[in-house]
Amino acid sequence: MSELSFMEKLLDGAEVEWKALEEVCDFKNGFAFKSSLFKESGLPIVRITNVDGKNINLSDVKYFDPSDYRENTASYKVCKGDILIAMSGATTGKIGFYSHENPAYLNQRVGKFLPKLETLNNRYLYHYLLSKVEKIYVIAGGGAQPNLSSSALMEKIKIPVPFPDNPAKSLEIQAEIVRILDTFTELTAELTAELSLRKKQYNHYRDQLLSFEEGEVEWKKLDEVSKKISSGGTPRTGISEYYDGSIPWLRTQEIDFREIWDTGVKITEAGLKNSSAKWIPENCVIVAMYGATVGKVGINKISMATNQACANIDLDDRVVNYRYVFHYLTSEYEYIKSLGTGSQTNINAQIVKSLKVPIPYANDPEKSLAEQARIVTILDKFDTLTTSISEGLPREIELRQKQYEYYRDLLLSFPKSEKRGSLI
Protein backbone atom coordinates (compact mmCIF):
# COMPACT_ATOMS: atom_id res chain seq x y z
CA MET A 1 0.00 0.00 0.00
CA SER A 2 1.37 3.42 -0.94
CA GLU A 3 1.93 6.05 1.74
CA LEU A 4 -0.85 8.25 0.30
CA SER A 5 -3.43 5.45 0.09
CA PHE A 6 -2.53 4.39 3.63
CA MET A 7 -3.15 7.92 4.88
CA GLU A 8 -6.38 8.15 2.88
CA LYS A 9 -7.66 4.90 4.36
CA LEU A 10 -6.66 5.87 7.89
CA LEU A 11 -8.15 9.35 7.77
CA ASP A 12 -10.98 8.63 5.29
CA GLY A 13 -12.25 12.15 4.70
CA ALA A 14 -11.56 13.31 8.23
CA GLU A 15 -11.74 16.92 9.19
CA VAL A 16 -9.06 18.34 11.42
CA GLU A 17 -8.97 21.29 13.75
CA TRP A 18 -5.72 22.77 15.02
CA LYS A 19 -6.22 23.54 18.67
CA ALA A 20 -3.92 25.41 21.04
CA LEU A 21 -2.65 23.09 23.74
CA GLU A 22 -4.50 25.16 26.34
CA GLU A 23 -7.79 24.10 24.70
CA VAL A 24 -7.20 20.38 25.06
CA CYS A 25 -4.69 20.15 27.86
CA ASP A 26 -3.93 21.57 31.29
CA PHE A 27 -0.42 22.23 32.57
CA LYS A 28 1.24 21.92 35.95
CA ASN A 29 4.44 23.73 36.92
CA GLY A 30 6.82 22.17 39.42
CA PHE A 31 7.46 22.91 43.08
CA ALA A 32 10.48 24.83 44.37
CA PHE A 33 12.20 22.07 46.29
CA LYS A 34 15.24 23.47 48.09
CA SER A 35 18.56 21.98 47.00
CA SER A 36 19.86 22.47 50.55
CA LEU A 37 17.21 19.97 51.70
CA PHE A 38 17.93 17.30 49.08
CA LYS A 39 18.39 13.82 50.56
CA GLU A 40 20.07 10.61 49.44
CA SER A 41 16.87 8.69 50.11
CA GLY A 42 13.18 9.45 50.48
CA LEU A 43 10.74 10.57 47.77
CA PRO A 44 12.38 11.13 44.35
CA ILE A 45 12.41 14.55 42.65
CA VAL A 46 12.34 14.93 38.86
CA ARG A 47 14.71 17.76 37.87
CA ILE A 48 15.40 19.18 34.40
CA THR A 49 18.54 17.02 34.17
CA ASN A 50 16.34 13.91 34.40
CA VAL A 51 14.47 14.81 31.19
CA ASP A 52 16.49 13.12 28.43
CA GLY A 53 14.41 13.98 25.36
CA LYS A 54 12.33 10.80 25.30
CA ASN A 55 12.04 9.49 28.82
CA ILE A 56 12.59 10.43 32.44
CA ASN A 57 15.95 9.01 33.51
CA LEU A 58 16.22 8.50 37.26
CA SER A 59 19.82 7.24 37.29
CA ASP A 60 20.92 10.49 38.97
CA VAL A 61 18.05 11.49 41.20
CA LYS A 62 17.71 13.51 44.41
CA TYR A 63 15.17 12.91 47.15
CA PHE A 64 13.20 14.90 49.71
CA ASP A 65 11.45 14.40 53.03
CA PRO A 66 7.85 15.79 53.05
CA SER A 67 8.25 16.75 56.71
CA ASP A 68 10.79 19.40 55.64
CA TYR A 69 8.01 21.40 53.95
CA ARG A 70 4.89 23.10 55.28
CA GLU A 71 3.30 22.99 51.82
CA ASN A 72 1.35 19.98 50.62
CA THR A 73 3.40 18.48 47.78
CA ALA A 74 0.78 15.88 46.77
CA SER A 75 -0.36 17.88 43.72
CA TYR A 76 3.18 17.72 42.30
CA LYS A 77 3.19 13.94 42.11
CA VAL A 78 4.37 12.38 38.84
CA CYS A 79 2.89 9.00 37.96
CA LYS A 80 3.48 6.38 35.31
CA GLY A 81 2.32 7.68 31.92
CA ASP A 82 2.83 11.37 32.69
CA ILE A 83 4.46 13.61 30.06
CA LEU A 84 7.00 16.13 31.33
CA ILE A 85 8.96 18.98 29.76
CA ALA A 86 12.15 20.82 30.75
CA MET A 87 11.46 24.55 31.04
CA SER A 88 14.97 26.04 31.26
CA GLY A 89 18.67 25.31 30.90
CA ALA A 90 20.46 23.11 28.38
CA THR A 91 17.52 20.68 28.18
CA THR A 92 14.85 23.34 27.49
CA GLY A 93 12.02 21.94 25.39
CA LYS A 94 13.02 18.32 25.84
CA ILE A 95 10.18 15.91 26.50
CA GLY A 96 10.17 12.95 28.87
CA PHE A 97 7.67 10.12 29.32
CA TYR A 98 7.50 8.84 32.89
CA SER A 99 7.46 5.03 32.69
CA HIS A 100 8.47 4.17 36.26
CA GLU A 101 6.12 2.25 38.54
CA ASN A 102 6.81 4.31 41.66
CA PRO A 103 5.79 7.99 41.67
CA ALA A 104 8.15 10.95 41.84
CA TYR A 105 7.64 14.68 42.39
CA LEU A 106 7.89 17.62 40.04
CA ASN A 107 10.71 20.09 40.66
CA GLN A 108 10.62 23.75 39.60
CA ARG A 109 11.34 24.39 35.90
CA VAL A 110 9.87 21.01 35.01
CA GLY A 111 6.30 21.02 33.73
CA LYS A 112 3.65 18.31 33.42
CA PHE A 113 1.02 18.06 30.68
CA LEU A 114 -2.48 17.03 31.75
CA PRO A 115 -4.39 16.17 28.55
CA LYS A 116 -8.18 16.19 28.61
CA LEU A 117 -8.57 12.51 27.91
CA GLU A 118 -12.07 12.85 26.47
CA THR A 119 -10.42 14.76 23.61
CA LEU A 120 -6.73 13.85 23.51
CA ASN A 121 -4.86 10.55 23.69
CA ASN A 122 -1.93 10.87 26.09
CA ARG A 123 0.59 9.10 23.80
CA TYR A 124 -0.69 11.03 20.77
CA LEU A 125 0.23 14.21 22.62
CA TYR A 126 3.63 12.72 23.52
CA HIS A 127 4.55 11.86 19.93
CA TYR A 128 3.35 15.23 18.69
CA LEU A 129 5.41 17.12 21.27
CA LEU A 130 8.51 15.16 20.24
CA SER A 131 8.08 16.60 16.75
CA LYS A 132 7.94 20.17 18.13
CA VAL A 133 11.04 20.30 20.34
CA GLU A 134 12.86 22.77 18.09
CA LYS A 135 9.84 25.07 17.86
CA ILE A 136 9.43 24.97 21.63
CA TYR A 137 13.09 25.93 22.02
CA VAL A 138 12.47 28.96 19.80
CA ILE A 139 9.45 29.93 21.91
CA ALA A 140 11.75 29.76 24.94
CA GLY A 141 13.97 32.39 23.37
CA GLY A 142 16.83 30.10 22.34
CA GLY A 143 20.30 31.44 22.97
CA ALA A 144 22.51 30.75 25.96
CA GLN A 145 19.75 31.12 28.58
CA PRO A 146 16.49 29.73 27.18
CA ASN A 147 13.54 30.04 29.54
CA LEU A 148 10.14 28.60 28.66
CA SER A 149 6.91 30.25 29.78
CA SER A 150 4.09 27.77 30.35
CA SER A 151 1.51 30.28 29.10
CA ALA A 152 3.44 30.89 25.86
CA LEU A 153 3.90 27.15 25.38
CA MET A 154 0.22 26.35 25.83
CA GLU A 155 -0.90 29.23 23.63
CA LYS A 156 1.56 28.97 20.73
CA ILE A 157 1.84 25.22 20.21
CA LYS A 158 -1.15 23.91 18.29
CA ILE A 159 -2.03 20.25 17.91
CA PRO A 160 -4.16 18.67 15.15
CA VAL A 161 -7.36 17.05 16.42
CA PRO A 162 -9.04 14.86 13.77
CA PHE A 163 -12.86 14.62 13.79
CA PRO A 164 -13.18 17.33 16.48
CA ASP A 165 -16.98 17.00 16.49
CA ASN A 166 -16.84 13.24 16.98
CA PRO A 167 -14.67 12.53 20.06
CA ALA A 168 -15.01 8.75 19.80
CA LYS A 169 -13.87 8.72 16.17
CA SER A 170 -11.12 11.23 16.95
CA LEU A 171 -9.72 9.08 19.74
CA GLU A 172 -9.91 6.01 17.49
CA ILE A 173 -7.75 7.75 14.85
CA GLN A 174 -5.34 9.03 17.49
CA ALA A 175 -5.02 5.53 18.98
CA GLU A 176 -4.18 4.03 15.58
CA ILE A 177 -1.49 6.65 14.97
CA VAL A 178 -0.10 5.92 18.45
CA ARG A 179 -0.09 2.17 17.77
CA ILE A 180 2.01 2.65 14.64
CA LEU A 181 4.48 5.05 16.24
CA ASP A 182 4.80 3.03 19.44
CA THR A 183 5.84 0.03 17.33
CA PHE A 184 8.89 1.98 16.17
CA THR A 185 9.75 3.29 19.64
CA GLU A 186 9.52 -0.22 21.09
CA LEU A 187 11.97 -1.50 18.46
CA THR A 188 14.37 1.31 19.31
CA ALA A 189 14.00 0.61 23.04
CA GLU A 190 14.81 -3.08 22.50
CA LEU A 191 17.92 -2.20 20.50
CA THR A 192 18.99 0.33 23.14
CA ALA A 193 18.65 -2.32 25.86
CA GLU A 194 20.72 -4.70 23.74
CA LEU A 195 23.35 -2.00 23.30
CA SER A 196 23.51 -1.45 27.06
CA LEU A 197 24.07 -5.18 27.58
CA ARG A 198 26.81 -5.31 24.95
CA LYS A 199 28.57 -2.32 26.54
CA LYS A 200 28.59 -4.15 29.86
CA GLN A 201 30.09 -7.19 28.13
CA TYR A 202 32.72 -5.01 26.47
CA ASN A 203 33.64 -3.43 29.81
CA HIS A 204 33.87 -6.87 31.44
CA TYR A 205 36.14 -8.37 28.77
CA ARG A 206 38.21 -5.20 28.56
CA ASP A 207 38.82 -5.20 32.30
CA GLN A 208 39.65 -8.90 32.25
CA LEU A 209 42.06 -8.62 29.32
CA LEU A 210 43.78 -5.51 30.66
CA SER A 211 44.21 -6.73 34.23
CA PHE A 212 47.68 -8.11 34.90
CA GLU A 213 49.37 -9.73 37.85
CA GLU A 214 52.48 -8.20 39.37
CA GLY A 215 55.49 -9.03 37.21
CA GLU A 216 53.46 -10.00 34.11
CA VAL A 217 53.96 -6.63 32.46
CA GLU A 218 56.23 -3.62 32.54
CA TRP A 219 54.49 -0.33 33.25
CA LYS A 220 55.73 2.48 31.04
CA LYS A 221 54.81 6.15 30.92
CA LEU A 222 53.12 7.36 27.76
CA ASP A 223 56.03 9.62 26.90
CA GLU A 224 58.29 6.53 26.97
CA VAL A 225 56.25 4.76 24.28
CA SER A 226 55.40 7.77 22.11
CA LYS A 227 57.14 9.57 19.28
CA LYS A 228 55.54 12.82 20.38
CA ILE A 229 52.83 14.14 22.69
CA SER A 230 51.56 17.57 21.73
CA SER A 231 48.60 19.89 22.08
CA GLY A 232 47.13 22.27 19.53
CA GLY A 233 45.78 25.77 19.48
CA THR A 234 42.83 27.97 18.55
CA PRO A 235 43.00 30.60 15.78
CA ARG A 236 41.68 33.95 16.97
CA THR A 237 37.92 34.00 16.79
CA GLY A 238 36.36 36.89 14.95
CA ILE A 239 38.87 36.72 12.10
CA SER A 240 36.89 35.23 9.22
CA GLU A 241 40.04 34.45 7.21
CA TYR A 242 40.96 31.83 9.82
CA TYR A 243 37.77 29.77 9.61
CA ASP A 244 35.60 27.87 7.09
CA GLY A 245 38.65 26.43 5.39
CA SER A 246 39.52 22.82 4.54
CA ILE A 247 41.67 21.80 7.52
CA PRO A 248 39.79 19.61 10.04
CA TRP A 249 40.12 21.18 13.51
CA LEU A 250 39.15 19.06 16.50
CA ARG A 251 37.57 20.32 19.73
CA THR A 252 37.28 18.29 22.92
CA GLN A 253 33.48 18.03 22.74
CA GLU A 254 33.99 15.80 19.70
CA ILE A 255 36.04 13.24 21.67
CA ASP A 256 33.84 10.38 22.87
CA PHE A 257 35.64 7.01 22.99
CA ARG A 258 35.46 6.42 19.25
CA GLU A 259 37.19 6.96 15.94
CA ILE A 260 37.10 10.51 14.59
CA TRP A 261 36.65 10.79 10.83
CA ASP A 262 35.64 14.44 10.56
CA THR A 263 35.31 17.61 12.62
CA GLY A 264 32.53 20.13 13.04
CA VAL A 265 34.83 23.09 12.38
CA LYS A 266 37.39 23.60 9.62
CA ILE A 267 40.16 26.21 9.64
CA THR A 268 42.28 27.76 6.90
CA GLU A 269 46.02 27.69 6.23
CA ALA A 270 46.15 31.23 7.60
CA GLY A 271 44.41 30.09 10.78
CA LEU A 272 46.90 27.25 11.14
CA LYS A 273 49.96 29.45 10.58
CA ASN A 274 48.79 32.21 12.92
CA SER A 275 48.01 29.99 15.90
CA SER A 276 49.47 27.12 17.89
CA ALA A 277 47.30 24.67 15.95
CA LYS A 278 49.34 22.14 14.01
CA TRP A 279 48.84 19.06 11.88
CA ILE A 280 48.91 15.70 13.64
CA PRO A 281 49.17 12.37 11.79
CA GLU A 282 46.33 9.89 11.65
CA ASN A 283 45.93 7.25 14.37
CA CYS A 284 46.99 9.40 17.30
CA VAL A 285 45.29 8.61 20.58
CA ILE A 286 43.76 11.91 21.69
CA VAL A 287 42.89 12.71 25.31
CA ALA A 288 40.56 15.58 26.24
CA MET A 289 42.26 17.72 28.91
CA TYR A 290 39.64 20.40 29.60
CA GLY A 291 35.90 20.82 29.78
CA ALA A 292 32.98 18.44 30.13
CA THR A 293 34.76 15.64 28.24
CA VAL A 294 37.99 15.69 30.30
CA GLY A 295 39.55 12.22 30.37
CA LYS A 296 37.71 10.93 27.31
CA VAL A 297 39.79 9.49 24.49
CA GLY A 298 39.47 9.09 20.74
CA ILE A 299 41.48 8.16 17.65
CA ASN A 300 41.79 10.48 14.66
CA LYS A 301 41.45 8.46 11.46
CA ILE A 302 42.51 11.37 9.27
CA SER A 303 45.25 13.96 9.62
CA MET A 304 43.90 17.04 11.37
CA ALA A 305 44.63 19.93 13.70
CA THR A 306 43.28 20.26 17.24
CA ASN A 307 42.68 22.91 19.84
CA GLN A 308 44.85 23.35 22.91
CA ALA A 309 42.59 21.21 25.08
CA CYS A 310 43.58 18.04 23.22
CA ALA A 311 46.62 15.94 24.14
CA ASN A 312 47.65 14.25 20.90
CA ILE A 313 49.66 11.06 21.46
CA ASP A 314 51.62 9.86 18.41
CA LEU A 315 52.62 6.40 19.61
CA ASP A 316 55.74 4.44 18.66
CA ASP A 317 54.39 1.47 16.72
CA ARG A 318 57.63 -0.45 17.34
CA VAL A 319 56.60 -0.69 21.00
CA VAL A 320 52.83 -0.35 21.28
CA ASN A 321 49.69 -0.88 19.26
CA TYR A 322 47.79 2.43 19.23
CA ARG A 323 44.44 0.69 19.63
CA TYR A 324 45.78 -1.21 22.63
CA VAL A 325 46.61 2.13 24.27
CA PHE A 326 43.18 3.48 23.26
CA HIS A 327 41.38 0.58 24.96
CA TYR A 328 43.57 0.83 28.05
CA LEU A 329 43.05 4.57 28.48
CA THR A 330 39.32 4.07 27.93
CA SER A 331 39.33 1.63 30.86
CA GLU A 332 41.12 4.26 32.97
CA TYR A 333 38.65 7.08 32.22
CA GLU A 334 37.42 7.57 35.79
CA TYR A 335 40.97 7.51 37.14
CA ILE A 336 42.21 10.02 34.56
CA LYS A 337 39.26 12.29 35.27
CA SER A 338 40.05 12.14 39.01
CA LEU A 339 43.51 13.62 38.35
CA GLY A 340 41.96 16.93 37.32
CA THR A 341 42.53 20.09 39.30
CA GLY A 342 40.70 23.40 39.70
CA SER A 343 36.99 24.17 39.48
CA GLN A 344 36.84 22.69 35.97
CA THR A 345 38.85 19.58 37.02
CA ASN A 346 41.21 20.03 34.08
CA ILE A 347 44.27 17.90 33.45
CA ASN A 348 47.45 19.00 31.66
CA ALA A 349 49.97 17.59 29.20
CA GLN A 350 52.37 16.61 31.99
CA ILE A 351 49.69 14.46 33.62
CA VAL A 352 48.99 12.78 30.28
CA LYS A 353 52.69 12.13 29.64
CA SER A 354 53.08 10.51 33.05
CA LEU A 355 50.13 8.11 32.64
CA LYS A 356 51.38 4.52 32.66
CA VAL A 357 50.32 1.68 30.36
CA PRO A 358 51.05 -2.04 30.87
CA ILE A 359 53.40 -3.51 28.26
CA PRO A 360 53.30 -7.33 28.11
CA TYR A 361 56.56 -9.10 27.27
CA ALA A 362 58.36 -5.75 27.23
CA ASN A 363 61.74 -7.37 26.55
CA ASP A 364 60.44 -9.11 23.42
CA PRO A 365 58.85 -6.44 21.14
CA GLU A 366 57.59 -8.97 18.58
CA LYS A 367 55.86 -11.11 21.21
CA SER A 368 54.60 -7.99 22.98
CA LEU A 369 52.98 -6.56 19.85
CA ALA A 370 51.44 -9.95 19.02
CA GLU A 371 49.83 -10.11 22.48
CA GLN A 372 48.61 -6.53 22.21
CA ALA A 373 47.13 -7.31 18.77
CA ARG A 374 45.32 -10.36 20.20
CA ILE A 375 43.74 -8.24 22.92
CA VAL A 376 42.84 -5.51 20.42
CA THR A 377 41.13 -8.00 18.07
CA ILE A 378 38.80 -9.16 20.84
CA LEU A 379 38.00 -5.69 22.15
CA ASP A 380 37.56 -4.17 18.69
CA LYS A 381 34.72 -6.58 17.96
CA PHE A 382 32.80 -5.32 20.98
CA ASP A 383 33.82 -1.74 20.26
CA THR A 384 32.45 -1.95 16.71
CA LEU A 385 29.20 -3.45 17.96
CA THR A 386 28.70 -0.77 20.63
CA THR A 387 30.09 2.44 19.10
CA SER A 388 30.26 2.20 15.30
CA ILE A 389 27.87 4.57 13.50
CA SER A 390 28.45 2.78 10.18
CA GLU A 391 27.70 -0.71 11.50
CA GLY A 392 26.67 -2.38 14.72
CA LEU A 393 23.89 -1.47 17.12
CA PRO A 394 24.32 2.33 17.06
CA ARG A 395 23.81 2.29 13.31
CA GLU A 396 20.70 0.13 13.67
CA ILE A 397 19.32 2.43 16.38
CA GLU A 398 19.99 5.48 14.21
CA LEU A 399 18.13 3.92 11.27
CA ARG A 400 15.16 2.96 13.46
CA GLN A 401 15.04 6.50 14.88
CA LYS A 402 15.02 8.01 11.40
CA GLN A 403 12.28 5.59 10.39
CA TYR A 404 10.23 6.60 13.44
CA GLU A 405 10.70 10.32 12.71
CA TYR A 406 9.70 9.83 9.07
CA TYR A 407 6.42 8.09 9.92
CA ARG A 408 5.74 10.43 12.83
CA ASP A 409 6.02 13.45 10.55
CA LEU A 410 3.95 11.69 7.88
CA LEU A 411 1.15 10.75 10.27
CA LEU A 412 1.07 14.08 12.10
CA SER A 413 1.48 16.41 9.13
CA PHE A 414 -2.16 17.29 8.68
CA PRO A 415 -2.91 20.10 6.21
CA LYS A 416 -3.05 23.29 8.26
CA SER A 417 -5.38 26.18 7.60
CA GLU A 418 -7.19 28.83 9.59
CA LYS A 419 -10.46 27.01 9.10
CA ARG A 420 -11.33 23.41 9.59
CA GLY A 421 -11.11 21.49 6.34
CA SER A 422 -11.12 18.09 4.72
CA LEU A 423 -7.83 16.21 4.79
CA ILE A 424 -8.42 14.36 1.55
Residue ranges: model-predicted function:
Residues 1-424:
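Charged, alpha-helix-forming regions
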